[in-house]
Amino acid sequence: MMTVRIATYEDVEQLHNLHFKLNRHRHQLQPKNFQGKSVDEGWIKDNIKSTHRDYFVLEVGGEIRGMALIEMLENYSIPGSVKYRYLNILDFMIESELDLDTYGHQLLKAIRRWGKDRYLSYIQLNELANDVKKIDFFAKEQLAVTQQTFKCVI
C-alpha cells in the first residue's frame, strides 16, 4: 500500500537517510557542485516546523521510500514583471528501486493539492541538467522549462 503524508518529527532519521541518497546521486552527476553527504538533522526539523515549508513523505509498505521538500514563495517584483505566490520544490526524491512515473506521480499529486489549497499560482523547481530521468518525469507531469541557469568558473 502507498500513502503520501506530511512529515513529522518521527520521520527525521528517515528523511536524513533519503537526503543522503539524494545528495549522493547529485554528487555522482555533478561532483564539483554537490557533496555526497546528508543534511543536518536540525535543518530537517526546522523545515518540518516551518510555516511556509513542508515535507511530504511517500510510504510504501509502511516504509518511507520518497520525499519532497516544498515551500511557498513570492517572486520578486521588478518593473514590468507580474507578482505571483508560487510553490517551489526544493528536493524531490523517490528511491531508485521504485518506478518514478508511478510513485513520483502520486507524490506530485499531493504537492499540487497543497499548492491549490494555498491558492498558489504555479510550481517551480530546479533540476540538474544531466538528471535525464527526472527531467523526463517532470516533462511528462506537464512541468515546462521556462528559464535556464548558466554557470561558469570565474
Segments and roles (model prediction):
Residues 3-17:
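A short beta-loop-alpha structural element at the N-terminal edge
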Residues 24-44:
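Conserved GNAT-fold acetyl-CoA-binding loop/helix
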Residues 91, 100-113, 140:
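Conserved acetyl-CoA-binding loop-helix of GNAT-fold acetyltransferases
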Residues 115-127:
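Conserved GNAT acetyl-CoA-binding A-motif
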Residues 129-147:
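Conserved active-site alpha-helix within GNAT-family acetyltransferase domains
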